[in-house]
């Protein structure tokens, strides 16, 4: 029997998707634009990083070749990868976190999420009125589209004075609630989010997100690691449910449990920051038994650097991840499969602060598996189906496994 390890570099797109124009994202390229900025010296930051983007281990697996495939080009002739590589398009109608992860796990999202308009106020009066009444709140602040760090800096002090939570949204299907961990209370914030989750179901909102923070002034406010996502359950069983139904474990690292509304996730291991998440993933690799799936999300790429349009920070985070990749590769044993991918793009050079509609990389390795191109995949769901095949699980309805190509190339 086999084991599988699935690492999602949150938002690490490799070039605009065929339907990117529908999202206003034609030309977006998270990886390409970061690499270009680094090569031009525009991502140098004293004490952080300098020079061209340095990702030798992902490049060895085939990152550049995957980006070429995403762009419709042939990979560089003569390139000999140390693993397999390809690019995948998204079939889901959105470019959000749940859609990307659910599709990776074999279930594209066929319906349109609900969204709140970019107006002030953004939320329907009926929704906010019910939230205030049912959660016993003195009111709410913000009620608009906003960057989380900006809106906390702007309204955090008023929140502490008044006890009103900060409620905001974005171009994603989200209702976010920020509150101070001690002045408002972490458990109280979670309770308010549970109420909001129930109320926004009528609006087809994908996630309610608790955004706790600490500090006493606009200069010192800082979000903590106690974020919690309250997601709609996937519309049908995912790869995770198939693993669980077979009596095996799904170890979710980071926010995986929240993204799947804890359906099919048998164990959750939380950590703060990409490097701590990497430590947790390595620990789970050590603990994984035959037939288990370790599913990790590395959120900092998206939340700290993509949305904040921080090119140097994103580049440094990629380089830090790449430096540690040999630790994961070194833990692979006969029968193991490791896949690196992403759930969408978030080009830090792009206009605005939101996700970008992009193809994502598929990079992977495993003892005895073939090396080279798996080509352009027409759905992220091919990743989940490949893992299902590898773990000898029943096939799903949406993706096409490429495991046979890895075993018989």
From Swiss-Prot:
It catalyses: 2-deoxy-alpha-D-ribose 1-phosphate = 2-deoxy-D-ribose 5-phosphate; alpha-D-ribose 1-phosphate = D-ribose 5-phosphate. InterPro entries: Alkaline_phosphatase_core_sf, DeoB, Metalloenzyme, Phosphopentomutase_DeoB_cap_sf. One of its GO terms (molecular function) is phosphopentomutase activity. Binds 2 manganese ions. CDD domains: PPM. GO terms for cellular component: cytosol. Mn(2+) 2 binds at residues 302, 307, 355. It is an enzyme of class 5 (isomerase). Mn(2+) 1 binds at residues 10, 343-344. Keywords: Cytoplasm, Isomerase, Manganese, Metal-binding. Its EC number is 5.4.2.7. It is found in: Cytoplasm. Its cofactor is Mn(2+). GO terms for biological process: 2-deoxyribose 1-phosphate catabolic process; 5-phosphoribose 1-diphosphate biosynthetic process; metabolic compound salvage; nucleotide metabolic process. Pathway: Carbohydrate degradation; 2-deoxy-D-ribose 1-phosphate degradation; D-glyceraldehyde 3-phosphate and acetaldehyde from 2-deoxy-alpha-D-ribose 1-phosphate: step 1/2. Its main location: cytoplasm. NCBIfam families: deoB (TIGR01696), PRK05362.1 (NF003766). Isomerase that catalyzes the conversion of deoxy-ribose 1-phosphate (dRib-1-P) and ribose 1-phosphate (Rib-1-P) to deoxy-ribose 5-phosphate (dRib-5-P) and ribose 5-phosphate (Rib-5-P), respectively. PANTHER family: PHOSPHOPENTOMUTASE. Belongs to the phosphopentomutase family. This is Phosphopentomutase. It comes from Chelativorans sp. (strain BNC1).
């Amino acid at each position: 029997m086999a084991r599988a390890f699935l690492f999602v570099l949150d938002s690490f797109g490799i070039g605009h998707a065929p339907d990117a124009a529908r999202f206003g994202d034609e030309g977006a390229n998270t990886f390409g634009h970061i690499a270009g900025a680094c090569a031009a010296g525009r991502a140098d930051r004293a004490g952080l990083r300098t020079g061209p983007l340095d990702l030798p281990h992902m490049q060895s697996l085939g990152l550049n070749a995957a980006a070429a495939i995403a762009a419709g080009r042939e990979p560089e002739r003569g390139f000999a990868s140390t693993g397999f590589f390809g690019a995948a398009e998204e079939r889901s109608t959105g470019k959000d976190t749940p859609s990307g992860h659910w599709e990776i796990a074999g279930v594209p999202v066929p319906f349109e999420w609900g969204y709140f308009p970019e107006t002030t106020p953004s939320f329907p009066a009926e929704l906010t009125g019910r939230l205030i009444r049912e959660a016993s709140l003195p009111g709410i602040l913000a009620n608009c589209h906003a960057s989380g760090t900006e809106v906390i800096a702007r309204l955090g002090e008023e929140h502490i004075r008044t006890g009103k939570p900060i409620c905001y949204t974005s171009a994603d299907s989200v209702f976010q609630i920020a509150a101070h961990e001690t002045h408002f209370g972490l458990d109280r914030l979670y309770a308010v989010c549970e109420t909001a989750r129930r109320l926004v179901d009528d609006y087809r909102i994908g996630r309610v997100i608790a955004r706790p923070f600490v500090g006493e002034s606009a200069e010192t406010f800082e979000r903590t690691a106690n974020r919690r996502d309250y997601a709609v359950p996937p519309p049908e069983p995912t790869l995770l449910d198939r693993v669980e139904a077979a009596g095996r474990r799904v170890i979710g690292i980071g926010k995986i449990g929240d993204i799947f509304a804890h359906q099919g996730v048998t164990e959750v291991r939380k950590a703060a920051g990409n490097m701590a998440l990497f430590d947790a993933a390595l620990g789970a690799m050590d603990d994984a038994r035959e037939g288990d799936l370790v599913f990790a999300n590395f959120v900092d790429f998206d939340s700290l650097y993509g949305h904040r349009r921080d090119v140097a920070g994103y580049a440094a985070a990629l380089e830090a991840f790449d430096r540690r990749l040999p630790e994961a590769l070194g833990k692979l044993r006969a029968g193991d499969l490791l896949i690196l991918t992403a759930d969408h793009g978030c080009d830090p050079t792009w206009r605005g602060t939101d996700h970008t509609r992009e193809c994502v990389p598929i990079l992977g390795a495993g003892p005895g598996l073939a090396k080279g191109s798996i080509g352009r995949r027409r759905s992220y769901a091919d990743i989940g189906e490949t893992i299902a095949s590898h773990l000898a699980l029943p096939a799903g309805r949406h993706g096409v496994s490429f495991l046979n190509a890895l075993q018989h190339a």
